[in-house]
């Protein structure tokens, strides 16, 4: 069924760096929660583009932008403020918006075709000896991405 999609963009994996942007990969949450499902996903034959920690863990919302969002008081920004309080993270990392950003703003990203598999503990392994089965995000124009995201959040005006 996954092969029917033209492309699947997924916040998934740690290919070249970890949560703290260190050079050692580690099991990423979406993978380690269900390693068997992750293995089926990566081997499905679908056209998968991964937004892994390599491009998501570096996208953070600084205090100035956070305060601007929270002063907006729209349904979306109020929800974001609630999540911020719930997670208790001073500078939230925007993991999932990056995967959506890959679809909306492809000009801000660079990807690399690689072969991805999952090891026994949930590491996402790139094997350069095998043919590519996916694309992995390797670059994001972080500043422009955050600017576009902020503009979207600030302009939305859903009814309450």
Question: What kind of region is each of these model predictions?
Answer:
Residues 5-8, 34, 38:
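Hydrophobic, well-ordered secondary-structure segments
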Residues 29-36, 42-160:
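Conformational coupling and interaction surfaces
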Residues 1-26:
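Class I SAM-dependent methyltransferase SAM-binding "motif I" and its flanking Rossmann-like core
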């Amino acid at each position: 069924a996954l092969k029917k999609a033209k492309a699947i963009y997924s916040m998934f994996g740690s290919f070249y760096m970890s949560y703290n942007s260190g050079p050692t990969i580690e099991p990423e949450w979406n993978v380690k929660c269900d390693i068997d499902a992750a293995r089926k996903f990566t081997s499905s034959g679908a056209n998968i583009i991964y937004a892994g920690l390599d491009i998501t863990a570096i996208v953070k919302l600084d205090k100035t932008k956070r305060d601007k969002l929270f002063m907006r008081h729209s349904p979306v920004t109020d929800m974001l403020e609630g999540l911020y309080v719930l997670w208790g993270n001073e500078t939230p990392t925007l993991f999932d918006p990056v995967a959506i950003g890959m679809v909306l703003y492809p000009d801000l990203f660079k990807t690399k075709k690689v072969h991805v598999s999952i090891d026994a503990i949930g590491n996402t392994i790139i094997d350069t000896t095998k043919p590519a089965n996916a694309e992995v995000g390797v670059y994001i124009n972080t500043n422009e991405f955050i600017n576009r995201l902020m503009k979207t959040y600030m302009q939305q005006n859903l009814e309450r």
